[in-house]
Amino acid sequence: MVHLKTLAGSAVFASLATAAVLPRQSASLNDLFVAAGKSYFGTCSDQALLQNSQNEAIVASQFGVITPENSMKWDALEPSQGNFGWSGADYLVDYATQHNKKVRGHTLVWHSQLPSWVSSIGDANTLRSVMTNHINEVVGRYKGKIMHWDVVNEIFNEDGTFRNSVFYNLLGEDFVRIAFETARAADPDAKLYINDYNLDSASYAKTQAMASYVKKWLAEGVPIDGIGSQAHYSSSHWSSTEAAGALSSLANTGVSEVAITELDIAGAASSDYLNLLNACLNEQKCVGITVWGVSDKDSWRASDSPLLFDGNYQPKDAYNAIVNALS
């Protein structure tokens, strides 16, 4: 979530392009998106935000899926070897269960927010054992409670080569197969995703690498169900046609589904949000959208005001435009 692409406000299809901004309506984003043929409209959260009454009220009323922003990352769950801390993740999963929400698990294998005891491992067999044990413990604990798992996250550089990480350095690209096969065995019913950012143009080297490797891994029997495009955008200069084309190119790899997994857009222009909404609506395999937070004040990009609710938890024009477009 470092390099942010930009999105141009080019034409969206007619029913969305003409959408006027309306006052906030009672129907939830999730209900409206499901009525439009998709599986969910979600957000990210964690225990502290779910205990914030203003934030929680919006999560409860607007979204159908919750992604843990940080509580399921390796440093949160297993800060020292074999010592798991489940309280934050348990809280989120329990909240989702009690409020009839689903959960996207995020993330099992990632180079960042990785404890030093893992990143300093120097032996391939040790790392393989540590990685498979971590996946088995985490996925096994929440078996049957997680809709999607982001199994591997941000594994490519911008030029399409593999990112320098302890996983790739010791195990080569085989760490991807090991991670997915382990996750599949631990919970056969969860959809398994590979997730990354800057997958925003079909001609971009990173997008092409993702598509090429996923096709290769699927042909080799690696159980990848979906590709997640994070969609952290900057201002209005990136072609929405390219964004839609990129989503299509990911869908055409042979995966069963794709999703927009961490959406936020600097400035939160209504036209930009509608363009991404439209890209998912027009791609049959796009099952849903997750926005990366509720209120601008709690965003990792707070100064960019990138979300659908302002710092006072009030709906912004982009929220109203989405509701109107889907109504």
Curated annotation (Swiss-Prot):
Family: Belongs to the glycosyl hydrolase 10 (cellulase F) family.
UniProt entry tagged with the keyword Cytoplasm: no
Name of the protein described by the UniProt record: Endo-1,4-beta-xylanase C
Domain of life: Eukaryota
Disulfide bridge partners, by residue number: 280-286
InterPro entries, sorted: GH10, GH10_dom, Glycoside_hydrolase_SF
Function in brief: Endo-1,4-beta-xylanase involved in the hydrolysis of xylan, a major structural heterogeneous polysaccharide found in plant biomass representing the second most abundant polysaccharide in the biosphere, after cellulose.
Gene: xlnC
Induction notes from the record: Expressed in presence of xylan and repressed by glucose.
Temperature dependence: Optimum temperature is 52 degrees Celsius.
Annotated Gene Ontology cellular component terms: extracellular region
Species of origin: Emericella nidulans (strain FGSC A4 / ATCC 38163 / CBS 112.46 / NRRL 194 / M139) (Aspergillus nidulans)
Known catalytic reactions: Endohydrolysis of (1->4)-beta-D-xylosidic linkages in xylans
EC number: 3.2.1.8
Main location: secreted
Keyword Hydrolase appears in the UniProt entry: yes
Keywords: Carbohydrate metabolism, Disulfide bond, Glycosidase, Hydrolase, Polysaccharide degradation, Pyrrolidone carboxylic acid, Secreted, Signal, Xylan degradation
GO biological process, one term: xylan catabolic process
